[in-house]
């Protein structure tokens, strides 16, 4: 295919040179606007592979219909905080302090960029809105969603009394920001004498807390928060599903791109072209309000493609830049997110050799790993342990004689942060609960032969079986291709 096309272009170019056409064409071309990269990609998007998408199973427990919103609404945050307060009340706690940005985002909806600058969120049971400690660069952002007051320091490291934006420029003493936080909470007021915190305090922090807030006990309630975050609400799952609509279309575009351009392109080009095309689709559909804050938060589709020996490394330290060739393993992978919700979506391919045949060893690894995906789907039932799911998958891998190609556990929990506990691992005895979300990665890797096959999706735990968020097939028709 590639040679024929190159020959046609070469012969056509010679003819144009001979006829003196090229010079005139260049003059005309210089006066015409050329299509942008995005427009060129739109023009070649055939949608052919989208016709192979799986239809939803009417007997399955999901996936849910996609959300029609771009992020979780403020009412959801308020209901979530109310649920958290009820759980705290069961332990006799009337106030909470969270310092993990993931917990702040989950509870309050305050999406922000995390750096070395500490931020914290405090709330009493009787407070209607959260109180924040925040740096100066976020002073507008923190007030734009749900704000009940707070204390601002200028930046890290903060000098006492220094607020250049107010015209106060001075080299004051370096401020201990944990003491700054405690002093702000003291002035705000604490309901009760116990504060739930999202992690244990260091002994040095406990000493400072005892001095600033005498008689107040700090209680680790991180187990409540991670338990809430692990079990997704219907609103979270609907937003998650929406992100996969775009993720699936990206997979179809990448597959069509490979089938169209074959061995003329690199894996890097496929990834970049697909990423540009699908994010143009995504951002054109979202309500971005001309760049206003709180619109389009944490929304993006990232596509990564690798071909050849790099597929044999679970977490490569080399770039994905290799020309696509026949007889190779290929992976199209990506991570999607709308309003922070979405996850991985990987498919493993085998490219036929020059004779149009598929390597038997690759077929074996591909088939066993694909079967493990289906096993995880069926085993993802409320009430079983993570360890049990991992045990059954690893036992199957050993029975099939592919144990030397096993490098890692079958899956990890999935959340806004990406990897989230619990883990489908032999040593994790956490009980699966309905609406927990997991990746799907029973990969097999053969570095000696330069091939590897790993998958992913979002598997949501159900009452009778799990369900997937993606509608991209796992079939030979989709994944075994000839170029």
Identify the residue ranges that each predicted region occupies:
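Active-site neighborhoods and metal-handling regions in enzymes and metal-associated proteins
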Residues: 2-483
